[in-house]
Amino acid sequence: MVKSKYLVFISVFSLLFGVFVVGFSHQGVKAEEERPMGTAFYESFDAFDDERWSKAGVWTNGQMFNATWYPEQVTADGLMRLTIAKKTTSARNYKAGELRTNDFYHYGLFEVSMKPAKVEGTVSSFFTYTGEWDWDGDPWDEIDIEFLGKDTTRIQFNYFTNGVGGNEFYYDLGFDASESFNTYAFEWREDSITWYVNGEAVHTATENIPQTPQKIMMNLWPGVGVDGWTGVFDGDNTPVYSYYDWVRYTPLQNYQIHQ
């Protein structure tokens, strides 16, 4: 009888220990492997690569976005084109395009060759972003390059760390960005972000830098309720387009810093 109890005790202990080991191992896999991390790439947009990219839709963002994202508003055939068009939905007056990577990216150089829309009330962007909808438990971290269609001779840089923004910086380009393709970039390090225009460093931030891996994104949208920032969008101007020639990501350890 004593021997029987002893065997039962050993069996229960073995079962519990096995569960503990399996659980511990599974948690390690989740932390180490589940978040998909991207590597260096160059995207020419000759065709749509659904292994690298996802088109947004069908859903809406916050209240200042007067559009619903639709996948058909993103096309790629040598150039990637985002489009705003009229379409009254239950929530918004227009449909628009947004593209994002499937993988996450960390410190490095993020570059784009693009031509923004020159229409008041619109925002053309290239940025990185993550939040709780992108990965469970992630803070709202974001790094922005944005063009306001009301004045495409200027570019806006911004970033958010755990939802805290207020880091806007406007730079006068000396040319109209909507008239030709130019290269815009930011170098993201653990302790700084430096933005570039055609290879020239034009702004650096060093305070409260975001740390979380993020997805690379591009979108074009009409604003509403933020007229002081974007200007007023006139729907008679639709369709509206922004164009992207190429995108490149280079991990920090893989490139020489711009001089």
From Swiss-Prot:
Temperature profile: Optimum temperature is 65-70 degrees Celsius. Thermostable.
Listed GO MF terms: licheninase activity
Enzyme class: hydrolase
Signal peptide (from-to): 1-31
Positions of the GH16 domain: 35-255
Keyword field contains rRNA-binding: no
Record field: catalytic activity: Hydrolysis of (1->4)-beta-D-glucosidic linkages in beta-D-glucans containing (1->3)- and (1->4)-bonds
Pfam families: Glyco_hydro_16 (PF00722)
GO aspect biological process, one term: carbohydrate metabolic process
Location of the active site: 142 (nucleophile), 146 (proton donor)
Keyword entries, A-Z: Glycosidase, Hydrolase, Signal
Classification via InterPro entries: Beta-glucanase/XTH, Beta_glucanase, ConA-like_dom_sf, GH16, GH16_AS
EC number: 3.2.1.73
Misc. comment: Beta-glucanases of Bacillus have a substrate range similar to lichenase of germinating barley.
Sequence similarity: Belongs to the glycosyl hydrolase 16 family.
Role: Hydrolyzes B-glucans containing mixed beta-1,3 and beta-1,4 linkages.
Annotated protein name in UniProt: Beta-glucanase
Organism, as annotated: Brevibacillus brevis
Top-level taxonomy: Bacteria, Bacillati, Bacillota, Bacilli, Bacillales
